[in-house]
Design a protein with these regions (language model features):
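Short proline/glycine- and polar residue-rich coil/turn motifs
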Residues: 78-84
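Solvent-exposed strand-loop boundary residues in beta-sheet-rich modules
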Residues: 65-67, 108, 122
């Protein structure tokens, strides 16, 4: 995968996301799958910053309930790159809440690469 830095007109930055509703810090799933960086969620907008995850095939971003199997969560789309800032939108009438997680998941092998538990921003 490639390094990304989303630069769309609706890009969320630290300046535009001064009041984050939810935040989390990525952690790797195990010794073979590392993840780091920050996730910020404001409304339906999700921002991964200083993000890095072990490269792998068929990686997707999911929003999951606590204890929920990743593939049963809400797909936010294919991972745009394994390094760099990136943006996603929560689809339809779904929403994020404290205690949920953002998970980087390999669809091909049904393996989690990393996750960030969401909590209220301070």
């Amino acid at each position: 995968m490639k390094k990304t830095d989303s630069s769309s007109p609706d890009e969320m930055t630290n300046d535009t996301m001064k009041v984050n509703e939810l935040v989390g810090i990525f952690q790797g799933a195990d010794e073979n799958h590392d993840a780091k960086g920050k996730v910020s969620i404001s409304g339906k907008n999700i921002r991964l910053e200083n993000f890095e995850v072990t490269n792998g095939p068929d990686l997707y971003v999911y929003l999951v309930e606590e204890g929920q199997e990743t593939k049963k969560g809400i797909s936010l789309g294919k991972l745009k790159g394994n390094i760099g800032n990136q943006n996603y939108k929560i689809p339809g009438d779904h929403s994020a809440s404290s205690g949920m997680e953002i998970v980087i998941w390999c669809k091909q092998f049904n393996v989690d690469f990393g996750r960030a538990e969401l909590g209220k921003a301070m």
